[in-house]
Structure formats: structure tokens, C-alpha cells
Amino acid sequence: MDIDPYKEFGATVELLSFLPSDFFPSVRDLLDTASALYREALESPEHCSPHHTALRQAILCWVELMTLATWVGNNLQDPASRDLVVNYVNTNMGLKIRQLLWFHISCLTFGRETVLEYLVSFGVWIRTPPAYRPPNAPILSTLPETTVVRRRDRGRSPRRRTPSPRRRRSQSPRRRRSQSRESQC
């Protein structure tokens, strides 16, 4: 069976494969980030979003994989075989879990559309011959605001990005349209 865990989120394994393996933080760092940002939603019995569900599943898979690796480490007598198993888990399974955790944490943090735009931008950048591409790769946190898809209220015209030079700006602070970290779901 050829199952792509990113398909329902608009991405593919191939799209994530453009990112080098050392791009992804360690599993420990990703788990700490998920816990710090989304612990309440992840532990909640309520359904929050498909990304929360996928993140829960990836975390549970990692816990089970570590349980298996510990068992193998304790029960496999041959050190060479033990090293082969540990290296395989760290190299192959570890990378897949790091990719999954990064993708879903990033989608929850930056928004799915922004992450997909980043993956496409990076994929284009990495496939462009070095002589024809900018020296620095795209950075997720610095993608232009225009990549974020925003809802518009019906019946209202879109707001201007810059005020007219003849008009004074309102004294009230501008509201941010991004989702606050307080509301996890």
C-alpha cells in the first residue's frame, strides 16, 4: 500500500523530501515544542483539528517505536545487530517522525497555506541551478504576508495595505488577524 500521510493536508512526501534531513529539529525538540504550544489541545478529549489528531498519532507512534527500540536494545545480545537496529530507527523512522511532527506543528503555528507555500518555494529554490537562484533559501517565518489566505467579511471591501498619504491613520491599534496561541482549536 502506498499511503501518503500528507495527502489530506494538501502536501506530499515528495514535497517534504526537498527539505534536507538536517533541516528538521530533533524529535525531542519537536516534542518539547508541541508540548509547550499545544499540550492542552493534544491532551483534550475534544477534537480540535486534523493537525492536532495527526500530531497525537505521530507522538504515539514515536512512543511505541521507542518502547520497541528499548526492548530490542535490552534483548538483542549481538552488539552489531543492536547497532544496525538503532541506526535504522534513527535514520529512517526518526526522519519520518521528525518530518511529520515538523509539518503538523508548523501548520498549527503558521497556518497550512503558509507551510504549503513555503514547501513549494523551497522546492523551486532547491531545484533551481545555483547560478540562477538567490543565495539564501526561503525561510518559513519570513514568508510575505500575502501568502496567508485570509477570509474577508461579506459586503465589505478589502482594506488597503497602506494608508493614503492625504489621510491620517486611525489612532486605535490595528488588530492582528492571525490566530492567537491561546485558542488552540
From Swiss-Prot:
Family matches, as InterPro entries: Hepatitis_core (IPR002006), Viral_capsid_core_dom_sf_HBV (IPR036459)
UniProtKB keywords: Capsid protein, Cytoplasmic inwards viral transport, DNA-binding, Host cytoplasm, Host-virus interaction, Microtubular inwards viral transport, Phosphoprotein, Repeat, RNA-binding, T=4 icosahedral capsid protein, Viral penetration into host nucleus, Virion, Virus entry into host cell
SUPFAM superfamilies named among the record's database cross-references: Hepatitis B viral capsid (hbcag) (SSF47852)
Residue ranges of the motif Bipartite nuclear localization signal: 160-177
Superkingdom of the source species: Viruses
Function field: Self assembles to form an icosahedral capsid. Most capsids appear to be large particles with an icosahedral symmetry of T=4 and consist of 240 copies of capsid protein, though a fraction forms smaller T=3 particles consisting of 180 capsid proteins. Entering capsids are transported along microtubules to the nucleus. Phosphorylation of the capsid is thought to induce exposure of nuclear localization signal in the C-terminal portion of the capsid protein that allows binding to the nuclear pore complex via the importin (karyopherin-) alpha and beta.
Taxonomic lineage of the native organism: Viruses, Riboviria, Pararnavirae, Artverviricota, Revtraviricetes
Stated family: Belongs to the orthohepadnavirus core antigen family.
PTM per Swiss-Prot/TrEMBL: Phosphorylated by host SRPK1, SRPK2, and maybe protein kinase C or GAPDH. Phosphorylation is critical for pregenomic RNA packaging. Protein kinase C phosphorylation is stimulated by HBx protein and may play a role in transport of the viral genome to the nucleus at the late step during the viral replication cycle.
Record's keyword annotation contains Ribosomal protein: no
HAMAP family the record matches: HBV_HBEAG
Protein name: Capsid protein
GO cellular component: host cell; host cell cytoplasm; T=4 icosahedral viral capsid
Native source species: Hepatitis B virus genotype A2 (isolate Japan/11D11HCCW/1998)
A Pfam family recorded for this sequence: Hepatitis_core
Chain intervals for the UniProt region annotation (RNA binding): 179-185
Modified residues (Phosphoserine): S157, S164, S172
A GO BP annotation: symbiont entry into host cell
Region (Disordered): 136-185
Bias (Basic residues) ranges: 149-178
Primary gene name: C
Compartments reported by the entry: Virion; Host cytoplasm
